[in-house]
């Protein structure tokens, strides 16, 4: 009778049909049975003639109780282990991205991002003072503001967010405040592309703008010139050179429609921010290419360009020199309109226009 009653209570305990109070009382009873079993085992060791044992139902109850306590111990240990391991892994991430000072993984990545944007996006650069990075478990998130210069004014145009997992970089999420900025199209026309060499459309656009404005214009030349020659050709114009498109491949029809690669011009406010050593803009461009080649996979993801081939371009520039086939200039609208009549300018595209800030 007692065994039947105990079995019924055990089934209720096993199926979770007891109240909390009943379950607590039953577990206390199981503890007593466990002690009782130990006592009997001890006596049996001294007297093998005893034939005492606990019923199968009670044995099952004791086993179930033991399993439950074991699961609880394992769960507690798992939680404690997790709470100990997570901070250690996060600390490891901080050390991975931060150790090495200037040459740490985190700093190298942020510098690569700044250089890549400067070389692949005409007149758009990273505002390094507003750069934000956050180290997380096994990774790092970096967000950098993008700026451009129009006239003498520097304006924010958007931001780019990049996630790293260890040394791998995910495709960036780019947010432009003005969608027009994101319309890359053809910034420049390569000298080899004779069919698109015209300034008519740009001249018409500039002629409709009032005198109290400053413009950003993408100029393309009849051929590639050394940087100094470009500046000398246009030294009589009241304009600023913000970015120069550099010829980094052999002059062929195939290169006519490729995206440009270049460097901030002599009047760009962002030139000093790159902090590259060199006696001239040409030296600085070569040094920037060398730095970018160290992390070309990062640069490809950040620029969203698989055609970088930095080592080949670097080899071409070192053999043939730094020659400019196009420039981004800014200045008074009417002054740039006059500049388009220079015989060295073969095509032009109008970019952003702002109210007078010259």
Curated annotation (Swiss-Prot):
Q: How does it sit in the membrane?
A: Single-pass membrane protein
Transmembrane stretches, start-end: 74-96
Question: Can you say where in the cell this protein is located?
Answer: Membrane
Q: Which GO terms describe its cellular component?
A: membrane
Arranged from A to Z, the UniProt key words for this protein are: Membrane, Repressor, Transcription, Transcription regulation, Transmembrane, Transmembrane helix
Q: Which InterPro entries match?
A: Sigma_reg_C_dom (IPR025672), Sigma_reg_N (IPR029101)
Task: Name the Pfam families on file.
Answer: Sigma_reg_C, Sigma_reg_N
Q: Which domain of life is it from?
A: Bacteria
Q: What induces it?
A: Cotranscribed with sigma-M and yhdK. YhdL and yhdK negatively regulate sigma-M.
Q: List the disulfide bonds.
A: none
Q: How does it assemble?
A: The N-terminus of YhdL interacts with sigma-M. YhdL interacts specifically with YhdK.
The protein here is known as Probable anti-sigma-M factor YhdL
